[in-house]
Design a protein with these regions (language model features):
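Interfacial segments at transmembrane-helix termini and the short loops linking adjacent helices
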Residues: 12, 16, 117-135, 258, ...
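Membrane-interface junctions at transmembrane-helix termini in multi-pass inner-membrane proteins
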Residues: 140-164, 348-375
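Hydrophobic alpha-helical transmembrane segments
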Residues: 128-134, 138, 163-211, 268, ...
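Helix-loop junctions and terminal segments of transmembrane helices
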Residues: 68-84, 154-155, 213-214, 271-296, ...
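Membrane-water interface segments that mark the loop-to-transmembrane alpha-helix transition
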Residues: 15-30, 56, 65, 69-116, ...
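Signature of the first transmembrane helix
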Residues: 13-73, 233-259, 406
Length: 434
């Protein structure tokens, strides 16, 4: 034990152990509470109502990506440069918040008519569709600021207040869902409870953010210019990804039926265990990677280690899913109990996508942006091929499509991260030689 304490890596390992246990335990609570809320919704909503709920949440995700447009990436990249200066970090945060409000208007104008069409196309009445659209607005409003307000805390590794806020929001949502869904099992109420809980959480999150970033600062033109450059490079690809990322739901909503929409939504709830991994990753790993100096060998070593360990964890999760698929499906209820093969396929696609997302998050945190025409081309090609290979009107066919698209995207983004790090090394060597 004494020898271990004198080991040069001892303090680092202990500190990481404390951080991971703290973050992991809090996220287990957050995800467990969220999982219970989700299961209540799955079990108590009718198949058709849950199909509407899935469509609305899918569109909410697309709206969130559109309203961000790469702004949060820009704020993280710029904030990583000035994270020790409260005033400068405040300027970065305020600039990002102001930019996002403007993007939100365009997002609403584009997304809500599409959602209205999909709801009506899948059997919703005008009243139901209208109520669902109205219920999305509070949830969307909350997403405009929460991801940005978290950045000062993440950069300063102030984990405890962030975790407390997430737990409080999850418990608040569960309380509201449990108190309404037994009496009023409607999709729009389930969506509304999530939005109200998040708005309450953001009020408190802003107080925590103020400790590290002065939110009374005004928008900074130079910071806006730097963030805008990232947005300009990111936006075309993000516009495409906000729809291609949920391509399975979009295709089924057009060519399939409400039952298939509900099935893919219910199976997606199981992937919350992987969401736990990504939340811990975004809180602990990405900000630290963003703060690293431009030392190619160090970046290369950490980039490789991170992706390797994530892959091992995902392989373990996928194996458990295969072995215990009957028990997992029992949790979802009788409407979804025969989807064993589909569950494994979905978790396979989700695992591959998670590796891709990890690589993407890491290199974006450095301010590296891939040309959008490359990412779009690399995604469109497997989608087109899949339409000829698989029956995309069925759930299983859509899941095969997901796996093929995710695999191509994973290879692309992991490779791009390595390319940028190796290019950085080459540039440094050239500058030293000159």
């Amino acid at each position: 034990m004494i020898k271990l304490k004198h080991h040069p890596k001892y303090d680092t390992i202990v500190n990481w152990g404390k951080l991971i246990s703290l973050t992991g335990s809090a996220q287990v609570i957050v995800q467990a509470v969220g999982f219970v809320s989700g299961i209540l919704i799955i079990r108590l909503l009718s198949v058709q109502e849950y199909a509407f709920y899935t469509l609305a949440n899918t569109m909410l995700g697309a709206m969130t990506v559109l309203s961000d447009g790469g702004i949060s990436t820009g704020v993280l990249a710029q904030g990583g440069k000035v994270w020790k200066d409260k005033k400068e970090l405040g300027k970065v945060l305020v600039t990002g918040l102001e930019m996002r409000k403007k993007f939100a208007i365009a997002s609403l104008i584009v997304s809500l008519p599409i959602l209205l069409y999909l709801l009506l196309h899948n059997g919703a009445g005008w009243l139901t569709a209208g109520l669902i659209i109205l219920s999305i607005i509070p949830a969307f409003y909350a997403t405009l600021s929460d991801s940005l307000l978290e950045i000062p805390l993440k950069l300063n590794q102030s984990i405890v207040p962030l975790q407390k806020n997430q737990i409080a929001v999850s418990l608040g949502r569960l309380l509201m869902v449990a108190s309404t869904i037994f009496i009023f099992p409607f999709a729009y109420l389930s969506i509304l409870t999530s939005g109200i809980a998040r708005i309450w959480g953001n009020i408190h999150l802003k107080k925590y953010a103020n400790e590290f970033a002065d939110t009374t600062e005004v928008e900074d033109k130079e910071v806006k210019k730097e963030i805008s450059l990232i947005v300009k490079r990111s936006l075309p690809g993000l516009i495409y990804y906000c729809f291609s990322g949920q391509i399975s739901t979009w295709i089924i909503s057009i060519f399939g039926n409400p039952a298939s929409i509900a099935q893919i939504g219910a199976l997606g709830r199981i992937s919350s265990v992987i969401t736990l991994l990504m939340v811990v990753f975004s809180i602990l790993i990405v900000p630290r990677f963003a703060r690293m100096q431009n030392q190619p060998q160090k970046l290369l070593r950490h980039y490789s280690k991170i992706l390797f360990f994530i892959s091992i964890i995902l392989l373990f999760i996928l194996t458990c899913t295969y072995l215990f698929s009957d028990q997992i499906l029992w949790v979802l209820g009788n409407n979804y109990k025969k989807l064993n093969a589909e569950l494994v396929l979905l978790m396979t696609a989700t695992s591959i996508t998670t590796i891709m997302a990890a690589a993407l998050s890491l290199y974006l945190s450095r301010g590296w942006i891939m040309q959008y025409y490359i990412t779009i081309s690399a995604s469109l090609l497997p989608i087109v091929i899949s339409c000829f290979l698989f029956d995309i009107s069925t759930l299983r066919g859509i899941l095969y499509l997901n796996i093929l698209v995710a695999s191509v995207q994973m290879i692309l983004h992991v490779s791009y991260g390595y390319y940028k790090i190796l290019k950085l090394n080459k540039n440094i060597e050239e500058s030293l030689n000159t």
